């Protein structure tokens, strides 16, 4: 019989998650404070339920991992990293289990990068019957928070480690918190509060395309909206570098006014 590790086991950490919701034997990572989700726009809540950039992290000498989760119709893969290196991906769409084998018996830091698309409720995992498991050492990497639209959410990427925030974080050695919300980057003050209240060494904000497409801010309110958002973040990050980015080039939008200008 394998050794079962409960989803709520405190030796498992959840880097990249803003909060975790525990129900029965499941843990669902959120990218907003889930207890306050009724305060957020419902469209944003839907995207925040997708664990882009969230990892389950632990240390073990197990040679196999069998994970359990809810079934979900449209969901990307789980990626396995060992000691920071990519090992394999597992399909999770319409599945309740995923498995990785032949991992060797050495003690290693394991990271399960969760799907950037689709709701994911973790229901625990099986490891080798005699394997040891402990909390991984504290990640001392610089902490990076990135906020943006679908450009940052990267729902079209093949797997969670092939999104551009994941590639940058792994290449540069950053501890990633991804707040990319497809179609929902509208300078919500509640998101500014989330960023404000989270530890960060670098913050990047990619702004504009959803505001243009959704016509949510006008020439009168766009600039003040950015300033207000940054001012909220600065309340607890007075000296943290903040990079303000425009979206990637978008033909058809560059010289065309929307309904609010």
Segment roles from a protein language model:
Residues 1-143:
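N-terminal secretory targeting modules
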Residues 49, 53, 189-261:
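Alpha-helical cap/lid subdomain in secreted, periplasmic
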Residues 86, 152, 184, 211, ...:
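Surface-exposed, flexible loop/turn segments at secondary-structure boundaries
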């Amino acid at each position: 019989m394998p050794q079962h590790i409960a989803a709520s086991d405190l030796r498992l950490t959840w880097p990249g998650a803003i909060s975790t919701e525990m129900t029965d034997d499941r843990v669902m990572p959120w990218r907003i404070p889930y207890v306050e989700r009724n305060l957020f726009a419902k469209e944003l809540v839907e995207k925040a339920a997708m664990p882009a950039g969230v990892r389950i992290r632990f240390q073990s000498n197990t040679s196999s991992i069998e994970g359990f989760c809810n079934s979900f119709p449209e969901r990307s893969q789980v990626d396995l990293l060992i000691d920071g290196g990519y090992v394999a991906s597992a399909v999770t769409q319409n599945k309740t289990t995923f498995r990785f084998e032949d991992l060797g018996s050495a003690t290693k830091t394991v990271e399960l990068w969760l799907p950037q698309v689709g709701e994911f409720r973790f229901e625990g995992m099986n490891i080798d019957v005699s394997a040891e498991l402990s909390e991984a050492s504290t990640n001392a990497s610089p902490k990076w928070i990135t906020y943006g639209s679908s450009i940052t959410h990267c729902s079209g990427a093949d797997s969670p480690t092939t999104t551009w925030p994941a590639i940058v974080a792994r290449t540069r050695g950053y501890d990633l918190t991804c707040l990319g919300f497809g179609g929902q980057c509208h300078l919500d003050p509640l998101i500014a509060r989330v960023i404000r209240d989270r530890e960060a060494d670098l913050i990047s904000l990619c702004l504009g395309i959803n505001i243009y497409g959704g016509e949510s801010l006008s020439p009168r309110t766009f600039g003040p909206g950015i300033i207000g958002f940054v001012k909220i973040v600065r309340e607890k990050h007075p000296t943290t570098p903040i990079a303000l980015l425009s979206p990637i080039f978008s033909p058809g939008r560059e010289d065309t006014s929307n309904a609010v200008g």
